[in-house]
Amino acid sequence: HGEYVHTETGKFLTGEQRALFVNGNIVYNGRLFKEIFFEPASPSSSFELKAVTIGRNFHWQRQEDQCFKGAFNLVTGENGIVVINQVDVEEYLTSVISSEMSAQASKELLKAHAVISRSWLLAQIEKNFRLGRKEEKQQNCYRDNEQLIRWYDREDHNIFDVCADDHCQRYQGITRASNPIVQEVIHETRGEILVNGETICDARFSKCCGGVTEQFEHCWEPIPHSYLTALRDSRETTFPDLTQEEEARKWIHSAPNAFCNTADKKILCQVLNNYDQETTDFYRWKVFYKQEELAELIHRKSG
């Protein structure tokens, strides 16, 4: 949609282009590359990727065609070609808040989402910068005589800032922002972030929950964050000690009142994208494993 420029040759491109991954190289127009750069010929130029996998390793995994703006480059990955979209923060957020939630959600919800997602993004970029400068060290495994604690997926992205799927934040292209309110929201919150002292908050969010949030250090990395503590997802603020087995069992086998525990189709249609509405048991659910599946899972996760 519009022209792009292949930066190495200066050639203007329109229409369908094809690149193949062969023996660790990108084959494009009969030549081998490790990386290829494309720049938009105008701000209105956009490109479409075919059969993009979304919801990777989740039960809603599927493929869809997606359209993006901005520059992009193709890079050789371990198992194929990686597409990296170079886009500014506010353009990125326009897609994120209408990919994670529906563009038809209320304006105030989308504004809150924009601030949270902007904060999370900048916190990750800042953290990666510190790690790159070796100002901060990241440890992924802790072991003593009684326990092994292993943290996963924290170093998955070393050639780009964040991925486009649920592992980071959904970034599913410009067509998701179907409501003009999305652009208004990004404009009105431009540059707004959450801070704790002089530090950008590593803000986290979820569409569904179990009725109580977990402390940051028990989910993401063993560093307490005073602004990400255990809270009840309800007007009622008290909850049992869920570190106790019996209390946790009672909580899980019941369905306490919670903001995220709703079956109101009007609300769900307003805030969720179509494929998210396919899942109805998002507050309490069951998963069944065979004995050999559990054994394999424990072996894989424990190393």
Predicted regions and their residues:
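Conserved, single-site charged/polar hotspot
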Residues: 1-303
